[in-house]
Design a protein with these regions (language model features):
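Mature extracellular/passenger domains of Gram-negative fimbrial/pilin and adhesin proteins
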Residues: 1-163
C-alpha cells in the first residue's frame, strides 16, 4: 500500500496600489470660480499605479475579476464627488477620470456607491505587471462665503475589489 497526497495551491492575482500624492499649484483667491464650480487653472494629473502579482502563464492573465475605486472620509456632506480641503474653508477638490467627476465611496455612509475607475475581467491579458489609471485633481469651490487663503488637504483611499 502507499499514500498519495495531492495539494492544490491556486494562483490568485493581486494588484497593490502605490501611494499617490497630487500637489496642486497655489491659486489666487481672486481666480477661484463661483460656488458649485471647479477651477479651470492649476489642475494636475497623477497616475494611480497598481503592481500586480500572480498573473497566469506567459500571457500575464489575471486569475479573477478586479475593480478599482476610491473612498474617503473627507467628502463634503451630501456629496460623493467633492473632497473638503479644510473644515473651515469653502474650497476643496474634485477628482476626474476621463473628463468625468469621480464618485468616491463615503467611508461613513456607503449607500451611494462609487465610480469604477478600472475593471479588469478574469483571464484578462495584461501587457505589463503594472496597471496605470490617470486621474486629475482640481480645486472646487463649494461655498464662496467661506473661501479664504490657506493650506488645503484631502485624502482618498485606493481600493481594489476582487470577485
Amino acid at each position: 500500500s502507499f499514500n498519495l497526497t495531492l495539494s492544490y495551491n491556486p494562483i490568485t492575482t493581486t494588484c497593490k496600489p502605490d501611494d499617490l500624492l497630487i500637489t496642486l499649484d497655489s491659486i489666487p483667491v481672486s481666480q477661484l470660480p463661483a460656488t458649485g464650480n471647479k477651477a479651470t487653472i492649476n489642475s494636475k494629473q497623477g497616475d494611480i499605479i497598481l503592481r500586480c502579482k500572480n498573473l497566469l502563464g506567459q500571457q500575464n492573465q489575471t486569475s479573477r475579476k478586479m475593480q478599482v475605486y476610491l473612498s474617503s472620509s473627507d467628502l463634503l456632506t451630501n456629496s460623493n464627488t467633492i473632497l473638503k480641503g479644510a473644515e473651515d474653508n469653502g474650497v476643496g477638490f474634485i477628482l476626474e477620470s476621463n473628463g468625468s467627476p469621480v464618485t468616491l465611496l463615503n467611508i461613513t455612509n456607503s449607500s451611494k456607491g462609487y465610480t469604477s475607475l478600472k475593471e479588469v475581467a478574469a483571464k484578462s491579458k495584461l501587457t505589463d505587471t503594472t496597471v496605470s489609471i490617470p486621474i486629475t485633481a482640481s480645486y472646487y469651490v463649494y461655498d464662496t462665503n467661506k473661501v479664504k487663503s490657506g493650506a488645503l488637504e484631502a485624502t482618498a483611499l485606493i481600493n481594489v475589489k476582487y470577485d
